[in-house]
Amino acid sequence: MNPIAQSKDSSREKLLSLLASNAYRHGTFTLSSGKKSNHYVNCKPVTLSGFGLVLLSDLFLPHVEEDSIAVAGLTLGADPLVSGLAMAAAQQERTLNALIVRKEPKGHGTEAWIEGPLPPKGSVITVLEDVVTTGGSSLKAVSQISKAGYKVNRILAIVDRQEGAAMEIQKSGLLLISLFNLDELVQRAKDISS
């Protein structure tokens, strides 16, 4: 089945099933935030697949602000997301460039924090994230983007683990929009395995 031809509702359901099957694991894990958890979500097997990225880009694009001229995110989780959205936007004849925020500055040359076709200073950029737990990674990306002279109003995430990210992001004056929360992912994984 071609996911491009599906409706938004069926695209969401299909993406949720892909995430539950390929991105979610139950066990004992240490998260990037340092927290221990029985639930692990690694979206890369989905975001690095053609169908997964098409579904995701289709669902994310309507949430990117109209005045946003770029999408950006912290490497590595956001790399396929920003590329997929830039391509989906181009297919709709919308200019939306992809930017990648490094975890530390490039060690040579320009020593850049941000890679990609940089927009004019003051431009609105939407930040993308695969999974949010505390919001730390997202806010690090926002900090570097803001220091570079750009404006961020919202963060789009695939999965919100519901462990404080929304509150921390809101405290920073930003809006968090997530396609799914951890409870939805856990339930779909249970449904698939039963």
Curated annotation (Swiss-Prot):
Cofactor(s) it depends on: Mg(2+)
GO MF annotations, alphabetized: magnesium ion binding; orotate phosphoribosyltransferase activity
Keywords, sorted A to Z: Glycosyltransferase, Magnesium, Pyrimidine biosynthesis, Transferase
Subunit structure comment from the entry: Homodimer.
Membrane-traversing stretches: none
EC number(s) given by UniProt: 2.4.2.10
Entry annotated with the keyword Cytoplasm: no
Chain sites annotated for binding 5-phospho-alpha-D-ribose 1-diphosphate: R102, K103, K106, H108, E129, D130, V131, V132, T133, T134, G135, G136, S137
UniProt protein name: Orotate phosphoribosyltransferase
Pathway(s) served: Pyrimidine metabolism; UMP biosynthesis via de novo pathway; UMP from orotate: step 1/2
Function field: Catalyzes the transfer of a ribosyl phosphate group from 5-phosphoribose 1-diphosphate to orotate, leading to the formation of orotidine monophosphate (OMP).
Taxonomy of the source species: Bacteria, Bacillati, Cyanobacteriota, Cyanophyceae, Synechococcales
Residues that hold orotate according to the record: T133, R161
Catalytic activity, as annotated: orotidine 5'-phosphate + diphosphate = orotate + 5-phospho-alpha-D-ribose 1-diphosphate
Entry superkingdom: Bacteria
Organism: Prochlorococcus marinus (strain MIT 9211)
Enzyme class: transferase
Family of the protein in this entry: Belongs to the purine/pyrimidine phosphoribosyltransferase family. PyrE subfamily.
Coiled-coil zones: none
GO terms, biological process: 'de novo' UMP biosynthetic process; pyrimidine nucleobase biosynthetic process
InterPro entries, alphabetized: OPRT, Or_phspho_trans_dom, PRibTrfase_dom, PRTase-like
